[in-house]
Amino acid sequence: MSNVNLTAETYTIPFQGHELHARVFRPSVSAIGRIFYFHGGGLVFGEPDDLPSCYVNLFLNAGYELVSLDYPLAPEQGLAVILEAVHAGVMGMLEILGTCADSTGSSHLPYYLFGRSAGAYLALMEAKRLCGSKSGADGADALSTESTAPAASGSCFTAPSGLLCFYGYHTFDLPEFKKPNAWFTKLPAVSKQTVDSLIQTKNGADDATPAFLTSGPMATRYSIYIYARQNGCWPELLGTPEDIARYSLSEEDFVLLPPGFFTASSGDQDVPFRESKQMARKISGSKFFPVYYLEHDFDRDTSKSEGMQAYQAALAWLKEHETA
């Protein structure tokens, strides 16, 4: 496998008086598809450039453009704003990159939504919105704030062709997310005072307006997530119980979604392994690729072969899906 020069084009998308950012990595040959990537981090930490370069190269060598999108983080921003920002980012980049049909009526690149962990949740929720809109259902009902994304006309709008979901979940309303997590309780306890000191406001301590953060380094933000999992209050950091229920996938939603590639490890200490397995069963045309006895983000350690094997399987699934 050759190493592609990982030089990215950068774009800015306006959103509710703030800025969202996208980085586009292009293959050296004509692209055959486009992949939108959302990072993980429990929606409270993480950065959009966290995908190891060996996996980026794998996509590029296979002929896919990779578009890495950021989004605002919780608890400064709630689920409604986060999901609306994701939609604004996707629609904005579809407009910029010209995924809509051109004047001759021929369609441009098919696109896929890819996320790891919380990023997979965002990919699923955005697919629900996009596919609901395409089918004539009220796909926008999942979000309550006004979008500032460029509007795609009905004549050129295309729904995503598929999903790539690595160790994700379809809801925050899981028993495992609402009680102390055994693995996280083994770590040094994080106090609420520490968490409160890490939550940022727009202009410092004298301003109660929540900050709009689109980057949250693990070194400074991971403690928020540890606290949430140690105390079983992760969903509470993201929104009200009504928000959590609303921003979830139902059995009816699974029918609307495009096929996906799902993978997770049986040794996942963070997110239930069954989530990926069950979603692959419920979404028609999907594939589940199990990994055994490794940690939640099993692809983080690139010295282990399981990560590369999962990405190679994902690419094989993409090829099968394109020719189906």
Task: Indicate residue ranges for each PLM-predicted region.
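The serine-hydrolase catalytic nucleophile loop
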Residues: 45-55, 80, 274
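Short amphipathic alpha-helix adjacent to the substrate-entry channel of hydrolases
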Residues: 49-67
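Primarily recognizes the serine-hydrolase "nucleophile elbow" in alpha/beta-hydrolase
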Residues: 95-190
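Accessory cap/linker subdomain of secreted extracellular hydrolases
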Residues: 166-250
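Short beta-strand/loop motif that positions the catalytic acidic residue
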Residues: 256, 262-264, 268
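Catalytic histidine-centered segment of alpha/beta-hydrolase-like enzymes
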Residues: 294-307
